[in-house]
Amino acid sequence: MREKQENERRGKGLKQYIADRRLAAVSLVLGVLMGLMILLGIRYSRNELIYRTAGQFLGQLAGWAVCMTVMVWAICVGLDALGRGWPEIRDFQFGKFLPVNSYQKRTQARRGKDCEDQGSSRDVESQGRESKQRAAKNSDLGTWLKWMFLSWCVYLPVFLAVYPGIYSYDASAQLLQFYGKLPLTTHHPLIHTLYLGLCMKIAGRLFHTYQAGMALYALSQSFFMSAVFSLCLCRMKARRAPQWLCVASWMFWILNPYLTVFSFVTTKDVLFGAFFLLSFDTACCLVEDPEHFWRGMCQKKEDLDKERELDKEKNLNETGSRKEVGKTGDWLLFFVSVFFMCLFRNQGIYVFLFFVLAVCLFLRKKVYRINWFIGASLLVAALWYVLSGPIPTAFGVGKGDAREMLCVPMQQLARIYHEVPEKLAPEEKEYIETLIDPQALSEYVRVNADPVKSGFHTEVMQADMGRFVRTWAEIGKRHPDIYLDSFLMGNWGYWYIGDNQYWISYILYDGAYLEDDLNILHITRNSHFQALSDWLREATLTPAFQSVPMLSVLLNQAFPFWLMLFAAGFAVWKRRAYEILPMMLLLGCWGTLLLGPVVSLRYALPLIYCVPRLLEMIVGLTGKR
């Protein structure tokens, strides 16, 4: 009899999901979008057409869309079933491992459900509260130290394996500028150039070898990365994330060979990614709990004061510490992280302004403290502008080349010139040859804009910007299919989850630009753990992981974008669409990647770092009605 009742209850639950129109709509939209990305991704990864007619394309798209729609629906139902706790799950007490948001905890506290001793006096309560507050603070520091220790149990052997560090990517060019061999410009972030150069100079003077300078840079950067990851794990624990998620997040950040190796690489993308992660984490906290963050930040003053009084009397979290409404610590961490994010990569300011615009559109009403947010955002933008423009110019620092932002149009023009020159008018062909060196045009490749970019004459474009725009637009108007194909061919790795990725060759484990005329400090690899070094080289330079189903997805640079789409759809289904707001940071960053010169793992690092936080958002939404 009992088994029959359980089966009926389970059947009701499944019928409830089947009848859910919102879930069906979300699954369909995501399914069609994911199916389209898979279909196009297969075409571009193979560099050949897998469909010959529009009918074939639509037929294959329909098939992929149905498969992905069913998959999205099943994942949503499965996660929600786990969160709500069906009978079998309750038997295993799975629900206690799921995070409980502070609004639920406050409601339970007000109803007296979490009070073990309702007859205790107020004095005893306050004493217990103070002791728990002290214990919570000590626990936070202890947790941070624990994660740091565990991280360095992994990082120390890796440092010995790659000693003195991985001198790669733009390090040679930056040091040539730092030591005056090349003119100093803002092409590379000044803060990173100074940081790298000072490490070399300080350690070089102290130890009389620039190998020590490289080691100082690698150690300081990896220490900062482990500190950021440990801080994020502490914040996860404070938000009552399940223990398994904290452990899985640590494994993803620290045991992932790609991310671990990058912690010792001389590229600005690593530190940019760290500050991006902090910005995203704090932005998520601002919307995850409306009672304590968005309402606390934007609520009218009289309502805010009432809420604070209620919290002082009744609101205790599980550690006994009192949660303050509108806590400013997260906002301070957010703006500091955003500021340094912008300094370490120019694209950061565009991502941040895109997020601010989304916040202003979402919070249209002028309520308490919204002006503070706008004012602080403008202050960050102004500080970035002053430190990136007027001050460097005053000290004789040159500006970066504008061609870095024009990879998409120059590739489109080069594609037309290289593959279908007969479709160009004589004056158009002549202008393209003036704009881009013929030698660079002959070296054109579909998946990398660097060869064409190296021969692009910015001064020709700037001399007559109108002609450049007109020529590009007129050719594109005649051949929109080639323009679109060129654009997608240059960035398919950021939105297609599949094998045959070409980004694997851009993890420069053994360094780059090590010729004597470029490597003026003569930095060389001197591994003290050769076996581990050989394993890391093989792991980062060969696509062997693609044979493992789960790893081939988790270590794919398109995975963060897919996870973001799923998290956004899941939030819409749960009628918590405001949780999409912090994802505007991810969407903005992803959008800038589409305009880049090549698909590379280091460019996608900021998005990859945010994967555990996205998973926490999804887990936090499970079971909510």
Give the location of each predicted region:
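Specific aromatic-rich, kink-prone transmembrane helix
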Residues: 179, 231, 271-294, 338, ...
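Membrane-proximal stem/loop segments at transmembrane-domain junctions that anchor or position
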Residues: 394-529
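Start-transfer (signal-anchor) and selected internal transmembrane alpha helices
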Residues: 2-35, 55-155, 621-625
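Membrane-interface anchor segments at the N-terminal boundary of transmembrane helices
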Residues: 60, 212-216, 490-582, 586
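Loop-to-helix entry region of an early transmembrane alpha helix in multi-pass inner-membrane enzymes
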Residues: 190-194, 205-230
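Extracytoplasmic catalytic/substrate-binding loops of multi-pass membrane glycan-assembly enzymes
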Residues: 162-174, 183-199, 207-212, 606
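Transmembrane-helix motifs of polytopic, lipid-linked glycan transferases
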Residues: 115, 219-240, 278
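Membrane-interface alpha helices of multi-pass inner-membrane proteins
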Residues: 330-345, 357, 379-384
